[in-house]
């Protein structure tokens, strides 16, 4: 994590709060657990709780290590923002690396606890990049978050990603394509998106 995080965060958040909503190029990552229902049918509730907490403990560091913030938890899903408040020219590549590390951490956990083939637990991840507005939404209860189509598309990609998959848009893939010459391409019809989306599965 950046050593001057507190100072940088304070500066960036102060700027955004003064201007209400600020357009910023960012990369959005959504990650959600897959196989929770199936797993709950094979192990006791107390053991399931331990597994989930172990997973959560390994999820956050993969994101923080790439100078990103976890903006919110939505059920079992997490929304991470790259390039705010810490700005990085390589924020797109960082998001992809964080996603792959997260998948690695999840796989290591499965091996440690000895999950069998029919006791599946995995993560589906969606990543998109572009300009978003950072700011507060709401009146009585204010939520500081990223706003815009980029967020929605990243969320929809996550919903289309299978367990163990990192699914990214063409905009993201353009930044990392040299690292993934064998990436699988997909034409995706996503809810709330009027056009077909070119997606790529990275591993």
Model-derived features: where do they sit?
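Regulatory cytosolic signal-relay segments
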Residues: 1-25, 180
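Allosteric regulatory "coupling" segments in signal-transduction proteins
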Residues: 92, 143-147, 184, 188
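Catalytic/regulatory signature loops of cyclic-dinucleotide turnover enzymes
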Residues: 128, 149-170, 191
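Catalytic strand-loop-helix junctions within cyclic-nucleotide turnover domains
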Residues: 84-91, 125-144, 163
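Alpha-helical scaffold within the catalytic cores of cyclic-nucleotide enzymes
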Residues: 53-68, 85-125, 129, 149-151, ...
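Cytosolic regulatory/linker segments at or just downstream of nucleotide-handling modules
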Residues: 163-203
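Catalytic NTP-binding/metal-coordinating core of nucleotidyl cyclase/transferase enzymes
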Residues: 20-97
């Amino acid at each position: 994590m950046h050593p001057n995080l507190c100072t940088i965060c304070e500066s960036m958040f102060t700027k955004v709060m003064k201007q209400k909503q600020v357009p910023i190029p960012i990369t959005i990552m959504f990650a959600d657990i897959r196989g929770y229902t199936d797993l709950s049918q094979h192990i006791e509730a107390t053991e399931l709780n331990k597994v989930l907490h172990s997973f959560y403990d390994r999820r956050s560091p993969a994101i923080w290590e790439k100078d990103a913030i976890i903006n919110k938890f939505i059920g079992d899903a997490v929304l991470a923002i790259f390039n705010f408040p810490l700005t990085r020219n390589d924020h797109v590549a960082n998001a992809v690396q964080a996603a792959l590390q997260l998948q690695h951490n999840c796989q290591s956990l499965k091996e440690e606890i000895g999950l069998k083939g029919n006791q599946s637990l995995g993560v589906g991840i969606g990543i998109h990049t572009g300009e978003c507005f950072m700011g507060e939404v709401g009146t009585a209860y204010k939520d500081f978050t990223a706003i815009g189509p980029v967020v929605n598309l990243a969320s929809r990609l996550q919903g289309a990603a299978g367990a163990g998959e990192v699914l990214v848009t063409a905009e993201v893939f353009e930044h990392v394509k040299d690292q993934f010459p064998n990436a699988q391409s997909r034409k995706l019809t996503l809810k709330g998106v009027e056009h077909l989306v070119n997606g790529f599965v990275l591993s």
